[in-house]
Every structure is written in structure tokens, then in C-alpha cells.
């Protein structure tokens, strides 16, 4: 073999061997997408599989994900994992998602809205989120399920956004952008400092003042770009450990049953609490309780 050919072969082998390592070094981003806070959705029916205009809601949801994905990839190659986080978690139009992402679908998963998120991710994005249960002007305000009236982590009242941010923080991942209705943005950014986009303006829990979807998606793209530009200064939201969890429910019969779980204590007729050694342990048990009270 001629020397030049031999050197070319060596260069090819070296580049082939380096390719997997280079792929592994790509930044990884996690997107959790709920539905109530998606722009253009102004009635609860649009978030339900049997509701009027649900298919339009799915299309709007998919469009917002693609807007953020486009902003991420405009800055360079990246790995992006999208986790459907609403209801049965089978809402996004998979065939209309940007083909460069991977997608988790289905509700039976240990970590629900943050399934797949671990310490290998550079940052997380929360899209389509809503405010916590009891928020007076929050559009479809709830915390996990309608049966939950309040959730506290280490004496801090949280909604789904803060709960998921606390989990992300426990694995060292900062949330750098969040989007949802105006009540969610106002509430979430009090606790977690992120680039935020109000996709609509909550009027009541059943109605909202909407922006055109194109306007919302343009704002999401711009906000994602700013969030990525400032990523180096972002810090995970960490609540520490152990994690004391307090859950207030609407049904006092349920609290009687939940206290039978080892480590769970009934505080009053509607409230139970427990202490978990880690945020992951706390999250799993909260998920179990949600599933139980939603039956």
C-alpha cells in the first residue's frame, strides 16, 4: 500500500472513531410541554381529547415546541428530548414535530412531566404550563390533578412548574425558560428566575385573552435565544434534602387511605405529609398519590 493511501486510511479510521465521542459531546436540552398554557387555547375543552377544537390545540402545542426547537438548533447541533406532559401524555402531533428531536409519549412513567431528565442535560425548557391550584385568575389552575388543593416542598407552596424545577435542580439542571398563561409566569418567576413568555392573559379559570399563535411562537423563539445566550449564568433551583412534602386534598376520605402508606402522616382532615431523603423519592411518591386520587 502506498504511503499516501495508508495515511488516508488512518485518517478515516481516526475520524470514524471520533464521531461517536463528538456526538456525545453535543449539548442536551430537555423540553417538558403541558397544554393548558399553550397560546391560542382559550377554553378547557381544547385540552381534552373529547373537547371542541382539541385537534387545533394539539397543533398549537406542537407548533410551540417546534418554535423553541428551531431556536435551539439555530445556535448549533444539539440533542433535544421532548416529554409530552399533559393528561394522558399523548397530545403532540409526532409526525409534525421537528424530526431532529426525540419524543417521550405516554402517561405511565415514574417521573411524569420530567421523565428522562437527568444530569446529562445542559438545561430545561417548560412550555404550556399553568398556575397552581387556587390561583384566582389562573387559566385552568391546578396542581397535578383537580383533587389536589395545595402542595408544599420544605414549606414552600409549589405548583407543577416549581415541583418540576425542584426535580431538575436536584440533578443539577437549570430551567432556563418557561412559558404559559400570565398567571403562571407571574407566579413561577417569583420563585425560579428564568426567561419567561406569557402566551396569553388569564381572565378567569375558564377563559383567556389570546394572542395570535404566530405572535406567540415568535416570542418563544426570541425568548429561547435569550435564554440560551445567558445559559452560562443560569443556576438550578435547589430546595435541599431531605424533602418534607405536604399535600392538601379536597376529599378527607382519601387522606384516611393515604396515611396507610408507610411514612405518610395525616396532619388534619384534608392534609397528609411525609419526608423523603431525596427529591427523586419525593417526586415518585407524589406521583403515586396523584394517580391514586385521580382514580
Predicted features by range, described:
Residues 24-44:
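Mature N-terminal segment immediately following signal peptide/propeptide cleavage
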Residues 18-23:
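Boundary at the C-terminal end of the N-terminal hydrophobic targeting segment
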Residues 99-117:
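A glycine-rich helix N-cap at a beta->alpha junction
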Residues 80, 216, 223-295:
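C-terminal accessory domains and tails appended to enzymatic cores
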Amino acid at each position: 500500500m502506498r504511503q499516501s493511501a495508508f495515511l488516508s486510511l488512518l485518517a478515516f479510521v481516526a475520524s470514524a472513531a471520533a464521531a461517536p465521542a463528538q456526538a456525545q459531546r453535543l449539548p442536551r436540552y430537555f423540553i417538558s410541554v403541558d397544554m393548558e398554557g399553550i397560546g391560542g387555547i382559550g377554553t378547557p375543552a381544547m385540552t381534552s381529547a373529547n373537547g371542541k377544537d382539541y385537534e387545533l390545540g394539539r397543533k398549537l402545542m406542537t407548533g410551540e415546541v417546534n418554535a423553541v426547537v428551531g431556536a435551539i438548533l439555530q445556535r448549533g447541533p444539539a440533542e433535544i428530548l421532548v416529554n409530552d406532559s399533559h393528561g394522558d401524555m399523548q397530545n403532540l402531533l409526532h409526525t409534525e414535530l421537528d424530526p431532529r428531536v426525540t419524543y417521550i409519549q405516554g402517561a405511565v412513567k415514574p417521573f411524569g412531566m420530567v421523565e428522562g431528565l437527568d444530569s446529562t442535560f445542559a438545561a430545561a425548557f417548560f412550555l404550556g404550563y399553568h398556575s397552581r391550584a387556587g390561583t384566582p385568575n389562573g387559566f385552568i389552575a391546578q396542581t397535578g390533578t383537580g383533587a389536589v388543593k395545595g402542595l408544599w416542598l420544605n414549606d414552600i407552596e409549589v405548583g407543577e412548574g416549581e415541583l418540576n424545577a425542584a426535580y431538575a435542580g436536584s440533578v443539577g439542571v437549570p430551567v432556563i425558560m418557561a412559558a404559559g398563561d400570565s398567571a403562571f409566569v407571574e407566579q413561577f418567576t417569583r420563585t425560579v428566575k428564568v426567561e419567561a413568555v406569557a402566551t396569553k392573559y388569564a381572565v378567569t379559570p375558564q377563559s383567556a385573552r389570546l394572542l395570535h399563535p404566530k405572535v406567540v411562537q415568535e416570542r418563544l423563539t426570541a425568548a429561547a435565544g435569550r435564554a440560551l445566550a445567558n445559559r452560562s449564568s443560569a443556576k438550578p433551583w435547589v430546595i435541599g434534602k431531605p424533602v418534607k412534602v405536604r399535600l392538601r386534598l379536597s376529599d378527607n376520605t382519601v387522606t384516611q387511605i393515604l396515611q396507610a402508606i408507610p411514612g405518610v402522616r395525616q396532619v388534619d382532615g384534608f392534609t397528609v405529609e411525609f419526608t423523603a431523603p431525596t427529591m427523586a423519592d419525593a417526586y415518585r411518591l407524589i406521583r403515586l398519590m396523584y394517580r391514586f386520587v385521580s382514580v
